[in-house]
Amino acid sequence: MINSPGVLRLFTWIASIMLAIAPTQLHAQPRTSEFKLANGLQVVVIPDHRAPVVTHMIWYKVGAADEPKGVSGIAHFLEHLMFKSTDKIPLGEFSKIVARLGGNDNAFTGHDVTSYFQRISKERLGTVMEMEADRMVNLRLTEKEVLTERDVILEERRSRIENNPAAIMDEQMNAALYYSHPYGIPVIGWEHEMAKLSPQDAMTFYKHFYAPNNAVLVVAGDVTADEVKALAEKTYGQIPANPTVGATRFRPQDPPQRAARRVEYSDPRAGKASFHRDYVVPSYMTAKPGEAEALDLLMKIAADGATSRLYKRLVVDEKIASSAGGSYSGSGLDYGTISLYAVAAGSPADLPKIEASLDKVMAELRDNGVTDAELTRAKSSYIADYIYENDDQASLARRYGWGLALGRTVAQIEGWPDAISKVTADDIKKAASTYLDTRRSVTGYLTPSVEAPRAEQSAPKSRS
């Protein structure tokens, strides 16, 4: 831990130098190329000629928050089913073919996006592009395959959620955080709805959302824009656009949040008691200019790591928590979240003390803001992470793919370090004053018990 004034001054000086030179370093990164095919597929190429490998990612502008009511989990379920078969690729062979070519592949589903990706040698890029384009439009499913895979996702839910008290707590708090917005529904789905998902549900979702004009292709690695364009036109370019996919994504929006909510969950499988607090805040897509960056820096200072205010107050000074932290998640299309937690060092009876101390830390941030030294350290840490990420091909592709799939531009994505560097202490104080408001939040207590697992949500109470 840094506690010497001299060391702190040295650290601040070094951080200032990093901020001064960071823009030059960042602008030296490989230049991206962007183009669009005639069928609407957006393509971004990120050259990286250090090794003869490429990362190929296709991002669909659809996620769990786009699901029709009553079929929660269908977006994630379809992600699983995409590894079944087409007329060209036999059942279960997609990943095996990629592996035989010396590569690896995976996929993931979020509330707003679904992505499929491969890392492969440069000379095999055309093959994986052909395979990925094939399953964009030619997926074949049998009832037996769908029902078998449905059992797989139900077991996944049981192992990841039902057998994990912390995951149950997170799910219950998230459901309480949103009034009607689908972010309150877990990506994996509610079990009672997952159990009824059918082949027709999957194919209806697939045929509507999986189309070139609803996707972004990102290729990073030892390639040129001309090479990728030729391959993209030969593969993805042969797929017609789907005119039924709208440019705007319609989701129910929540009304203003006016009442704090609480969730208490007891489970005999829980270890130490823990405190949780989530706030609904703007995302990078919905915040005013500079506001999301201010929230990022606010949480870096408030709750990220052992030097954060929250950790020092609860763990080091008061010793009422064994760990504490938090973060800002601003990657949502409609909303972002601030999440805070602390694990009690003692018994569940300490949770009210933890809550009171955490509230004091939040009040100090609202009333007094942050110091210049804290702000400089937070900026330099973020920009250093950004620079290091530029050396990771997959991270680069993910950065561009996720942002573009949400509707951000290449200029906005590449301009993030400059936007971070322009945030002032006043900007952070304003963000804290506006958004660290318990009326926008859900507070949770997770406690061990000898009782059967239960979850309770109290009725919202108006704040006087």
Residues covered by each model-derived region:
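Active-site SXXK
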Residues: S72-T86
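N-terminal secretory signal peptides that target proteins for export/translocation
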Residues: M1-L8
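Sec/Tat signal peptide C-region and signal peptidase I cleavage site
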Residues: T24-A28
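Non-catalytic, conformational "gating/processing" segments within enzyme and secreted inhibitor domains
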Residues: R150, Q200-T235, R440
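Bacterial N-terminal signal peptides
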Residues: R9-A22
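M16 family metallopeptidases and their MPP-like homologs
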Residues: I46, A51-E67, G73-F77, L91-R135, ...
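His/Glu-based metal-binding/catalytic segments typifying zinc-dependent metallopeptidases
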Residues: R158, A175, T244-T307
